[in-house]
Structure formats: structure tokens, C-alpha cells
Amino acid sequence: MDFRQAQRNLELIEEVAKNSQDSDEPIIDEDDLKEGKVEEEGEGTQIPSMPFSDDDDSDNNSKDTFKETPLELVDKEEAIEDKAPNDDEPVVSVEEKIATQEPEPEEQIFMNTQIQGQLDDIEQEDNLRSKLSNFKYASEESSSVQVIKRSNERKLKSKKITKPKLTKTSKRTKTNSNPSTQQTLDEIKISRSENILKLLSGKHGKVKDMINHQRNVEKKVKLVKNKNSNIITYDTYNSEEWLRIMKLILEKFPSANDMEVKQVYHYIYGEEQEQEYDNLWEASQIPLASMREEAYNEDNQIDRKIPNIPNSTQTRVEVMSLSQVMDDVSIIEESKKTTIDSEREMHIYEVPDSTDDEDSRIIRVISGSDEVASIVAESEFSTETESTSTQFFTADGNMVDGVIDLTQGSFKAVTKLFSPLKVDTLLSINKNKEKVQVAVTRTSTRFSNLGSGPVGLEETPRLAPDEAATPPTVISRSPQSTRTPQATRLPNPNITVMYEVNKCELQSSNSYQSRSSEDIRIVNQYDIDVRDSQDEYDSATEKCLIEFAVTNSATPSVQPEDVMNVISSQSVQKLRQDLKTIGLKPVRTKAKMIEALMAASQVLDTDNVDQEQTREALYDQLTSMIKQIPELVSKISRFEPITMEELVLQLIEVNPFADHIDESTIKEWADIQGITLRNN
């Protein structure tokens, strides 16, 4: 709106107000009446045309009420122009009146501010209406109509949506209601699992193939089970029982032919083709194919030769004793035995067997000759062409023929036992055969070129740890003293062990005295001829004696005082790390740390730097402690849960050192041992 037009409208309003005051009965046209009615109807929304007041108090009210005057002013201006020809007054234009009338400066400022405020309000309303016109509810009439239309549309949409749903559900109910599910399942014979698989996968063809395949497999399994149920189960007998059965058959049926005996044999041991048994014990008792070939001739006849006595050498089972297996021995077959002269210096001992109290000859190789080394190498690196089955010999040296020996069929550990003495050690012995070295240790000692005496040089007496601290004294130096070989500990460590040595190839006695003058003393030395038998050794008066004095090598190398000094000299951080490494309880003070480590040094070998070794030693100590408590052992064997408090208390009763062990370490050990622990 233009500023001039607004000012003109205001002047017209003033004129209309003056005319209304001058005339008692103002002439009102029909248009004016219509406009008045509209103003009365829209009092809430439209502002009546009121003249501006000069008072400042009425300014605020005029701002609120005067809003839509410009539209009305235009209409009134047209009405005044229409009424102008009827009046007698001369027509004066509005512009002339505005030019003639000059308002005061104060009124002019006030009018300008009021007009500008009204103009701003009008522009704001126009902008707001333009924005509201973009919405659906621009007016009350349009909004009510639109609400009705939308409600009708919603009803139509809901009707359209619900109708297809009803039709769909009705179709589904029709399909499900036609035949009952139980009848269809009974008619088609569909199992519950098959139905579930169909529902889950939806691939009916694949499911049918899978189920048919499974049914065929089950049918085959049933047929195999039925066949196996008709098969006769066979009992297993050892060789003595089988010989007893054969003897009874031949006594009761002397006219029985070999085929009948064969049928009895197959009834006991089963057919040759039926060797695949589910039971491992039955499979282990089946005779070997080689034994069956030896038992039967080419005409499928059984050797009917029966021994007269049951305790014959043919039925005797040869079993190696534990001492034969663990000792440094080698079994040499009779076909491969080589005759070695006494100059080869080989000691032969007779070790009693644990089953039949008969002696088996075991050869111990001590010499360092190349020939013996080659024999050991051949026995160690045996070729694959040799027989893989273990050979057992009787006293007569013949294999058991015609008798099923369970030991040959079920035990296939090794082909032969040979000496673990390596070729490298033999060669080193051969190089140093001119020198004799005696190690000052508690372990066994070997000699390379010393004579064949009745004493095993490996059987050096070992000292008891409790008695090793006492100093040794020489009891006997008799040249004729001999002793029997016994690998036992001496009850008294204060003994000087005397060894008889024949044919001493000693270059000088100073070499031995220089090595260890305290432990080895040359008593006497003579030139002795080599004898051919043990009797000549006993009758010989000239002997070379070497005296081996038992020393205090069993005493601990580190005294407890030294250990205490070493531990106390370490820092607190190092002590704490040692406690963590061993698996002991963490403590705060250094004195308690030293106490715990001292207790561990008395029980464990704390010299090991490796954490795994220290933990394993601690676990072994706990295991040895738990074995001393029968009640806990019985609970552990029955897998009964044990409380941590109970376990620790009982371990402390056995050994107070358990009080220093951390609970986490005990839990790890219990987990390894399979002990079930529960909280207190």
C-alpha cells in the first residue's frame, strides 16, 4: 500500500466523521447497511472504522483494533464519490484538500508512526494469510468440508482394505477345512519328522529323497542285524585249553577224521573270513594267519600231535622280566650268536626269569672293539626284511609248532631288544682305551679296558642322603676280598669299596693320583698275565688293586646359611617375582617373603630358572602330599567335590609348607589332576 493512499484514506475518515456529527439523520445507502451488517457479524474478526484520537492513552487501543480499515476505506471513498453529484456542495478533490491542509509537525510525526505501525501489521497479516493459504484448512468452511471429505475417504479406504482380507481368510479356511489334517497324514503316511522338515524347508522333493534314503539305510541295518543274530558266537581258548579239547575229542571219538576236528576248531575260533569283530578282545584272541598255515597242511588237515605232559616246553610261554627289559642288555638269537673270546672282555650273567625260574643268557658288551661296535650297530639299524613278529625261545631253542600261542598273536611291541649303548660312546671308549677315568660322582661308572671281574662296575654303591655327611674310613684293604654283585644301597656309607682289576694297562700311577689323589689311590701294581678262566683268576696271587673311597659328594653343594644370605641380599621386587614364579602367596613384608622362599628351598629345587620346571616341582610336591591323605584320595577317586578350605587344612597338616602356596596355584593343580573343588 502506498503512503499517499493511506494518508488520503485517513483524511476521508475525518471528513465522514464531521459530516455525521453535523447531520442529525445521516443518509445511509443500502450498501452502507450491508456493510454495517457485515461489521456486526464479524466483530470478532474485523475492526470497526474508528477515528484516531489525539490522546496518547488511546494509541495502544487503536493499534489493536484498527486492522482491516484499508479495505473499508476504499469502499467508503467510492460511496462518497457516488453521493457527490446529488449534493449541492462543490466537489473538491482529496488531493486539493491534502495540499491545503498542512498538519502540525507534532501531529505529523505521530501520524507517520501510527501509519507505519499499521502498515507493518497489515503486511504481516498478508504474509501470514499467504502462508496459511497453502494449508488445507484455510477457512472454517473449507476446513469443515475437507474434514468431512477425509472422513468419507477413510471409510471408503477401510472398506476397500477389509474386503480382500475377508476373502483371503475365507479362502484359507476353506482349504484347511476341506480334509482334516489327521486323515491326510494317515493316508499319505507322513511321519512327524517328515512333516516338520517340509514345513521348515519347503523343498518337498529333496526331503522325500532324504527320508527314502534314510529308510533304505535302516532297512539294510536291520537285515544285517538279523543275519548277525543267526551267526554263532565263538568262545576263545588258550593253547592249553585247545590241546585239552583235542585230546578229549580223540579219546571219545578215536575214529574222527581230520575234517571233523577242523569243524570243532572253526566252531571255537570262527571262520577265517569272519575276522572283523566289534569286540576288541575277541579280535586279539584270533590266531595269526601264519600260525593257521602252520597248523593246517595243504590238504586242510590238522596236526594231531599232542604233547604227553601239559608242562612241556612247547606249551611254556616265554615272558621277559622287568629287570631284563630295563637293564642295559641285548638279546641275541641263537642263529646270530657269535662266539667272542675271553680276550674280547664280555661279562655274561644269568638273570632268572620271572615265570619259569629258568635262566636266560644276557650278554653285556663292555669292550670297545670295532667288532663289537659293528654288532651293536647291526642290531640297532636292522633292515625291514627281517621278521616283524617278536621271537620267543624255549630252553631247547625251538618254536612252538602246532600250538596257538596267544603271546605271539597279541603282543607285537618290538622285533628285538638290543643294548642302548650307542656307537658314538663305543668309538669314544675305543679312542680312550689307554686311559682310565673315574668320575667322582654318585652315578654309575663305566670302565673301558678293565678286566672281567665278578663285580659289575656299574653297581657302584649309592649313598643314602641322610648318611652321606659322615666322613668315610677305610675298613678293609685285603687283596683277596671279593663280593657278589648286588645293586643295593649300603647301610653304612663309611666303607671303602675294593675292586679287583686284572691286566691293568696303566701307564703310570701319577696320572691317577693327579686326577683325584683323595678319591683314587693306587695300592699296588704288578704285571699280571691274562688268565683264561675264573679259576685261574681266583688262584692268582698277583693282583692290581684300585681302592675307591666313598666321598661326601652326597652333601648339598649349597648350605642353608648360604641360601639365606642369597635370598636376603635380593631386592623386594625380585623376591616378589620369585614368589609369583614359584606359585606362593604374595606377602607384603620382606621378612615373610624370605621365610616363604626358605621354606620353598627346603622342599623344592629353587635353582631352576624356568617357571614351568618350578611349577611342575610344586605340583609334584602337592601330589605326594595328597597321596598321604586316604580320605581325600577316596573322594577324588569318586569325583566328590572338595571344599578349598578342607583341602588346604589337610595339606597343611601333612606339610606346613602348604600354607605358603597360593590358592590359585592349588586350583590349577587340582584342575590338572581332575579334582573337583567348590567354594567354601
Curated annotation (Swiss-Prot):
GO terms classed as biological process: DNA-templated DNA replication; double-strand break repair via break-induced replication; double-strand break repair via single-strand annealing, removal of nonhomologous ends; interstrand cross-link repair; regulation of DNA damage checkpoint; regulation of DNA double-strand break processing; regulation of meiotic DNA double-strand break formation involved in reciprocal meiotic recombination
Record's keyword annotation contains Nucleus: yes
Compositional bias per record (Basic residues), positions renumbered to this chain: 156-174
Gene symbol of the encoding locus: SLX4
This protein's UniProt keywords: DNA damage, DNA recombination, DNA repair, Nucleus, Phosphoprotein
Function in brief: Regulatory subunit of the SLX1-SLX4 structure-specific endonuclease that resolves DNA secondary structures generated during DNA repair and recombination. Has endonuclease activity towards branched DNA substrates, introducing single-strand cuts in duplex DNA close to junctions with ss-DNA.
InterPro entries in the record: Slx4_ascomycetes, Structure-sp_endonuc_su_Slx4
Sequence segments annotated as region (Disordered): 15-92, 141-183, 450-490
Regions of compositional bias (Acidic residues) in chain numbering: 22-33
Polar residues bias locations: 473-490
Gene Ontology terms: cellular component: endonuclease complex; Slx1-Slx4 complex
Post-translational modification: Phosphorylated in response to DNA damage.
Primary location class: nucleus
Gene Ontology MF term list: 5'-flap endonuclease activity
HAMAP family assigned: Endonuc_su_Slx4
UniProt name for this protein: Structure-specific endonuclease subunit SLX4
Biased composition (Basic and acidic residues): 60-86
Lineage of origin: Eukaryota, Fungi, Dikarya, Ascomycota, Saccharomycotina
Similarity comment: family membership: Belongs to the SLX4 family.
Location of the protein in the cell: Nucleus
Highest rank taxon of the organism: Eukaryota
Subunit and partners: Forms a heterodimer with SLX1.
